Amino acid sequence: MNFKKMNFNSMKRIALSLMLVSVSMLSVQAQLLYKISKDSTDQKPSYIMASNRLMNPMGVVSLSGELKEALTNTDQMYFEVNKTAYKETINDAKKLADGKTLLSLLTPAQQTKLNAFLKKYMEVDFRSSYVQKKYGNLTPAALMEDMEQLLFVANHMGMYDPTHTFDQYFEAQAKANNETVGGLSDVDAYINATYKSDLKQQVARLVEFLENEPTELAKLNKAVGAFKAQDVDVAAKATGAHVSQPTLEAWAAKVQTVMAEKPTFFVVDAANLGGENGLLQLLRNAGCKVEK
């Protein structure tokens, strides 16, 4: 017997048990947890946990038997992007370069649409000092993220809490187990695809969101409802994947490389997991066994 391994796993179980006490009101959904393995190898299985970027995990995900087993029997944790390790880099990338401001990118008509949205949900004008300090130099994509959260929170008070996200929840698990944390996407690739993409396209997407508020809210509601129903395919269909198809394909390759090194616990947004072209299907296509 490998006493050191047994001792380490025992320590992990103790840490998980202590955390379970603190979240004893939660209920785990095994259908959001997938076991991934390669039939041709003797490597221990890895696991993928579906997450949702707008929901507070407290009350949705907890340490059930299946999840405790997955966390105990894996040796590292991977997210879509290791945002914690590169927090400052990502925050800097959200800001417009060369002294540009968001107002300078928007036409008067587009500014009017943004003002109407902010007045409805924040009761402030975009030109106010508070809003300018908070949003004035953000890229349209970064502002879009915040506006999407604002729209969802305003219509679902208590369901989203920026201090309790899925990534934060599972990062705490990794920290308790002294595990390595990594990202499926390199931080530079993530930044380039998200905040440094064509500004005109970013503005167009922001304006589309502002002009179609009811439709956008319906998409978010459907995705969240699908997540609660543990249906990643419907979640993916509701909003579409949040990343490009080439990125999903790169992730599928990275998952296989990482899990071949050591058993890994992956946390990926449900919208990126489900669907005919989602990460789970790409892994199946590559010969991986995907089990609920």
Can you describe what each PLM-predicted range is?
Residues 3-16:
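Bacterial N-terminal signal peptides that target proteins for export
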Residues 25-30:
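Sec/Tat signal peptide C-region and signal peptidase I cleavage site
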